[in-house]
Amino acid sequence: MADTNRAVEKLQGKFEASILEVKQDRGDWIVTVKKEDIVAVLAFLKQECKFDMLTDVTAVDYLGKAADRFMMVYQLTSVPFKDRLRIKAPVAEADCVIGSATQVYGSANWLEREVFDLFGIRFDKHPDLRRILMTPDWEGHPLRKDYPLQGPGREPYKGRLS
């Protein structure tokens, strides 16, 4: 599959009920899907559409701006066809769990651990979901928009910075 347009069309045909939005931004296709289908969508794109590389996994916190607080973002690349595709999935704060992409892309392992560590989003069936950047005893998730700027229970630094 050499053309992202055709990959998006195939995705729409196979996962019509799962797709929430399809749009283009600055030449890149962005497809938003229900979080319940993220693993199946990623597997389909890898196997059927040759998006063989997961370039990045991250999250966005839309505190107070969207019905679902978080948006998971997966950046895929087709190396043979030099194509990119972004897949997004909304995640509610009340049910802050999504399927793990490690079942499809092994490279998702540390990327998902980073999202868990910094945003608190859990990944179902992740092989080793634990903190990767913050210490194990760290309280909270520092990239959440409601996280205290000075950190939990920490005094502002009063020394010299230079």
Swiss-Prot record:
It comes from Trichlorobacter lovleyi (strain ATCC BAA-1151 / DSM 17278 / SZ) (Geobacter lovleyi). Pfam families: Complex1_30kDa. This is NADH-quinone oxidoreductase subunit C. NDH-1 shuttles electrons from NADH, via FMN and iron-sulfur (Fe-S) centers, to quinones in the respiratory chain. The immediate electron acceptor for the enzyme in this species is believed to be ubiquinone. Couples the redox reaction to proton translocation (for every two electrons transferred, four hydrogen ions are translocated across the cytoplasmic membrane), and thus conserves the redox energy in a proton gradient. Its EC number is 7.1.1.-. Keywords: Cell inner membrane, Cell membrane, Membrane, NAD, Quinone, Translocase, Transport, Ubiquinone. InterPro entries: NADH_DH_suC, NADH_quin_OxRdtase_su_C/D-like, NADH_UbQ_OxRdtase_30kDa_su, NADH_UbQ_OxRdtase_CS. It is a peripheral membrane protein. It is found in: Cell inner membrane. It catalyses: a quinone + NADH + 5 H(+)(in) = a quinol + NAD(+) + 4 H(+)(out). GO terms for cellular component: plasma membrane. One of its GO terms (molecular function) is NADH dehydrogenase (ubiquinone) activity. Belongs to the complex I 30 kDa subunit family. NDH-1 is composed of 14 different subunits. Subunits NuoB, C, D, E, F, and G constitute the peripheral sector of the complex. PROSITE patterns: COMPLEX1_30K. It is an enzyme of class 7 (translocase). The keyword NAD applies.
